[in-house]
Amino acid sequence: MKLLEDRIHSDGQVLGQDILKVDRFLTHQVDYQLMKEIGKRFAQVYADAEVTKVVTIEASGIAPALYAAESLNVPMIFAKKAKNVTMNDDLLITEVYSFTKKLTSTVQISSKLIEEGDKVLIIDDFLANGQAALGLVHLMEQAKAEVVGLGMVIEKSFQDGRQKLLDQGMKLTSIARIEKFEDGKVIFAPADDIAFD
């Protein structure tokens, strides 16, 4: 999506060899208009997939997932990283490693929210090593739900997450794909949604 690539160029900041800071529009401050366009794009790509639920992981995946769910007219559920006192029923639980935070979190979703046979679209903010996405896929497998696709706002294609998901037979759509960082600049690979631009 050219709109997202332009925003990454103008407001993204490359940190070191493998980190992109996008806190001006996605990971801290949220540009709701951009997120709405991204959500609409995911809905276009998966319009024929009969999605019944959109699932993400807190926190930065929530905005694009919510707008995708709105466009698809289905509920959005986010996996929580911390259990609270109201989550006292059966839980779907898995471990997820965060590349950026360098820590492993236990994530959970109430089993009452995902039904056997649900057709789930998983949305997340970044795809790096694929651990968050694979963790969400594992939660959906526990619920006997079908993952019909994965939508990533930004993919770091120079890391192995994409290949891990494709090796699992997943349909993957990344709105912006980063081929590499060069001299502090982002070099893009062709995005998966290019037919919609």
Curated annotation (Swiss-Prot):
- Which residues participate in xanthine binding? 20, 27, 156
Q: Where in the cell is it found?
A: Cytoplasm
The record's listing under Gene3D superfamilies reads:
3.40.50.2020
Gene Ontology terms: biological process: purine ribonucleoside salvage; xanthine metabolic process; XMP salvage
Chain positions recorded as 5-phospho-alpha-D-ribose 1-diphosphate binding sites: 128-132
Quaternary structure note: Homodimer.
Known function:
Converts the preformed base xanthine, a product of nucleic acid breakdown, to xanthosine 5'-monophosphate (XMP), so it can be reused for RNA or DNA synthesis.
UniProt similarity note = Belongs to the purine/pyrimidine phosphoribosyltransferase family. Xpt subfamily.
Q: Protein name, please?
A: Xanthine phosphoribosyltransferase
Phylogenetic placement of the source organism: Bacteria, Bacillati, Bacillota, Bacilli, Lactobacillales
